[in-house]
């Protein structure tokens, strides 16, 4: 039996679709307050048989911070896909994020070892990797180094990954994936899908940054292939960057705008403008009580120029990525349908 954590998130929901549409029954861990409606919504992007596949999920109430609920959830489980994590670039969330992501992963590792789980796939992030000084491509061997510029999210993903390496040292067979920025359809109000909504609503600015991007469908396909009987022994106890290609944020925004038939962002957001913007957002947040729409962390992230190599997995198991252009076009098409169908236009 397979257990998926974080099944209501972007990666987890797409993973559940891939597993159930392949005929597999799956356990999925969910907190009591979790809303599974988005899982069905994501299924509907790819099939008319939503209920057929959704019914193959056995939802198990639990929390990665509650070790004993994990013991119960892991009964009969031989493989785990760990997708659960809090993602935030608000400094106020750092303590909560570190506690949830690191302690939660540690709990799951301990429970997996105690229950004899045979295979474990951990969804880490490029945020858990280091940076190169000369601008060369970042690989699996580019190790994380402490820095005051690291975001709370980066810290949480690095130390979460360290929990997995600890588990490996204690005898757990595991594989780690480090996706770049994950593109995919889902809740258009949060995460990377929100970029499509922002451009739809007329985003006017772009930044100087460069980063890696990958389709969520490629992420889950890679995870399943890495856990497959035919290559797990070859790939276990390693990590793999999942990155289809590197692109400037300006090009990324332009491609989204073209896909949505919206104007391209024309104004360059300089360092000075961004610094003023996040300071003003922070001040406004103090008076309104609402969360700032831009933070020091988001400014830092969108200004960095990082290039990532996703070649290790292609060289190891022959994995092939979708092109970034086709991924953006597919997501834009789904977004446009979502914008039209709810209003019946």
Regions found by a protein language model. Give the residues of each.
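Amphipathic terminal alpha-helices
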Residues: 310-318, 322-345
């Amino acid at each position: 039996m397979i257990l998926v954590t974080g099944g209501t998130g972007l990666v987890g929901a797409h993973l559940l679709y891939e597993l159930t549409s392949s005929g597999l029954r799956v356990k999925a861990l969910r907190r009591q307050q979790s809303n599974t409606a988005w899982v069905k919504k994501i299924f509907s992007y790819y099939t008319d048989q939503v209920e057929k596949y959704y019914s193959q999920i056995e939802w198990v109430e639990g929390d990665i911070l509650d070790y004993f609920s994990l013991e119960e959830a892991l009964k009969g489980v031989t493989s785990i896909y760990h997708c659960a994590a809090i993602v935030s670039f608000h400094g106020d969330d750092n303590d909560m994020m570190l506690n949830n992501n690191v302690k939660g992963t540690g709990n799951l590792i301990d429970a997996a070892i105690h229950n004899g789980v045979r295979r474990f796939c951990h969804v880490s992030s490029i945020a858990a990797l280091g940076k190169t000084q000369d601008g060369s491509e970042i690989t699996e061997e580019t190790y994380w180094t402490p820095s005051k510029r690291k975001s709370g999210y980066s810290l949480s993903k690095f130390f979460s990954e360290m929990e997995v390496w600890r588990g490996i040292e204690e005898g757990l067979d595991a594989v780690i994936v480090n996706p770049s920025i994950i593109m995919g359809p889902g809740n258009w109000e949060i995460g990377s899908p929100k970029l499509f909504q922002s451009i739809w609503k007329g985003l006017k600015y772009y930044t100087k940054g460069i980063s890696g991007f990958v389709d969520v469908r490629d992420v889950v396909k890679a995870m399943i292939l890495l856990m497959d009987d035919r290559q797990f022994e070859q790939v276990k106890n390693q990590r793999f960057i999942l990155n289809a290609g590197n692109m400037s944020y300006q090009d990324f925004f332009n491609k989204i705008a073209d896909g949505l038939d919206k104007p391209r962002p024309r104004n360059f957001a300089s360092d000075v403008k961004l610094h003023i913007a996040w300071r003003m957002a922070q001040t406004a947040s103090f008076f309104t009580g609402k969360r700032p729409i831009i933070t020091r962390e988001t400014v830092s992230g969108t200004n960095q120029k990082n290039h990532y190599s996703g070649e290790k997995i292609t060289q190891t198991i022959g994995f092939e990525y979708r092109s970034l252009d086709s991924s953006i076009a597919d997501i834009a098409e789904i977004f446009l349908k979502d914008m039209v169908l709810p209003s019946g236009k």
